[in-house]
């Protein structure tokens, strides 16, 4: 079978066979993400026709106004994972605390926990901008057969066993890694099947796109200001192109394909940064590194940060390796 004609299901089965002692649990998690993503995709594509755009009237733990689609996507992913009894715990941007999944026999025997942002960029849904789902999977630390604890979720990113995102745009794609490269699958809406469309995805070593909210320029650290000036300076290979959508998944996806850097630094308005380490930065960092890119907080590797809280925020510099390293040079000289 031609590589690009493979369905996601076939790809998962083939890769599971490559591991002698694989139990299939991780494969079932990816399959559950696939199923939930199709349900959410259907609702996202109908958002302008039904009463599901706009604010839900409540705030999440971050103090952000929840969108109706945030709430819907959160429920879909959580219920899909719980009903299939394939994880022992779930943490979501939309929930204050993690959820313990007992299983029908109350045995707590599953090996993995999942952390997710069920609908990244949802504040843009009203204006028809691409949104996405981000997920990260860890093997639990506490003994199998016992309820999960915060220790199972507060792991550094280097312990991730899988991570990925779904982008709901002009086409719907699921991109993920299990530590052996990055592959992208595009949904054929006519038959509801994901097909391998982007095998072995790689960040270009360099790029000419920088993605940062320049409206916050006056609030940025001097190192970030200096890097932005560097990107704008007219040289042989510059100025770079500024592209910022405001949806992490969409900005990251474009930069991985075309080459670029995404920056969300600390600022005088957000002293710790805005993006969440566990279910935004860690999974994107894992994907970036598997695709030959780099992800740091401006000074050190994102995936080596030891989390201290579930909704911890960090600054984020992610993209083509040489561009991230150049940004780090400016941060170090600050």
Swiss-Prot record:
Report which reactions are catalysed by this protein: beta-D-fructose 1,6-bisphosphate + H2O = beta-D-fructose 6-phosphate + phosphate
Q: Which cofactor does it need?
A: Mg(2+)
Q: Does the keyword Ligase apply?
A: no
Subunit structure comment from the entry: Homotetramer.
Please name the gene that encodes this protein.
fbp
The record's listing under Pfam families reads: FBPase, FBPase_C
- Magnesium as a keyword of this entry, yes or no, is yes
Q: Which residues bind substrate?
A: 120-123, 213, 244, 274
Pathway the protein contributes to: Carbohydrate biosynthesis; gluconeogenesis
What's a GO biological-process term for it? Answer: gluconeogenesis
Q: What is this protein called?
A: Fructose-1,6-bisphosphatase class 1
Which keywords appear in this protein's UniProt record, sorted alphabetically?
Answer: Carbohydrate metabolism, Cytoplasm, Hydrolase, Magnesium, Metal-binding
State which Enzyme Commission number(s) the record gives: 3.1.3.11
Query: What is the predominant subcellular site recorded for this chain?
Result: cytoplasm
């Amino acid at each position: 079978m031609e590589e690009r004609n493979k369905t996601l299901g076939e790809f998962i089965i083939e890769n599971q066979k490559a591991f002698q002692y694989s139990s299939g649990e991780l494969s079932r998690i990816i399959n559950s993400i696939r199923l939930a993503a199709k349900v959410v995709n259907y609702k996202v594509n109908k958002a302008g026709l039904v009463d599901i755009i706009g604010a839900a009237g409540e705030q999440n733990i971050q103090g952000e106004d929840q969108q109706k689609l945030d709430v819907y996507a959160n429920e879909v992913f959580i219920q899909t994972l719980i009903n299939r009894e394939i994880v022992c715990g779930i943490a979501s941007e939309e929930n204050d605390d993690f959820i313990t999944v007992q299983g029908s026999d109350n045995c707590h025997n599953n090996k993995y926990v999942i952390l997710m942002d069920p609908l990244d960029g949802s504040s843009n849904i009203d204006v028809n901008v691409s949104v996405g789902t981000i997920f990260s999977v860890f093997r639990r630390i506490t003994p199998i057969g016992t309820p999960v604890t915060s220790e199972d979720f507060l792991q550094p990113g280097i312990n991730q066993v899988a991570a990925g995102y779904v982008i709901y745009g002009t086409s719907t794609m699921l991109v993920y890694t299990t530590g052996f490269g990055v592959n992208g699958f595009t949904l054929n809406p006519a038959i509801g099947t994901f097909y391998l469309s982007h095998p072995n995805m790689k960040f270009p070593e360099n790029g000419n796109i920088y993605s940062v909210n320049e409206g916050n320029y006056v609030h940025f650290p001097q190192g970030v200001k200096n890097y932005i000036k560097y990107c704008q300076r007219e040289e042989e290979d510059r100025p770079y192109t500024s592209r910022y959508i405001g949806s992490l998944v969409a900005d990251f996806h474009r930069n991985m394909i075309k080459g670029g850097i995404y920056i969300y630094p600390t600022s005088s308005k957000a002293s710790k940064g805005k993006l969440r380490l566990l279910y935004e930065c860690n999974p994107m960092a894992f994907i970036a590194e598997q695709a030959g890119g780099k992800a740091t907080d401006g000074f050190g590797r994102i995936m080596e940060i030891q989390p201290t809280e579930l909704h911890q925020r960090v600054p984020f510099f992610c993209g083509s390796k040489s561009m991230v390293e150049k940004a780090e040079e400016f941060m170090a000289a600050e």
